[in-house]
Amino acid sequence: MAGKKSEKLPGKNQSQGEKPKLLSGGNPQIAKGDGDSVVQDYIAAMPGWKGDVGRCLDSIITRTLPKVQKAVRWNTPFYGMEGQGWFLGFHCITKYVKVTFFRGASLRPAPPVKSKQIEVRYFHIFEEDKIDEEQLTDWILQASKLPGESLF
């Protein structure tokens, strides 16, 4: 999380100008990289209604935390605070977008879906859901103040 920008290169099976491959569950295959640009590429490649969810999530996070750090690894956008690690990521599942709070068990109220990892909690957004921006903003603020994960 050094804040350095890395050059985005097309994925293994992607050449310049081609749409990213969609993996299992419709998750876009995006080359790893740091910064807003690669996250926007991921969001642009999210299929259908999931792209709207991705844009909404990114907007809420960026509006709430203007200095947030962004990266894509393992076909997942990550958000974190400089020097504190990563606090949130999201990716496409067949029927929903899974938002991961790495220290979600410490949030109040905790996001509703438990993980096998005791600290991790999930929030699933389905196509018909209306996004509760107030609750998400509160979770994002709380999560950004906790020690994040050093994932990469």
Task: Locate predicted features.
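Charge-dense, helix-prone N-terminal extensions
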Residues: 2-152
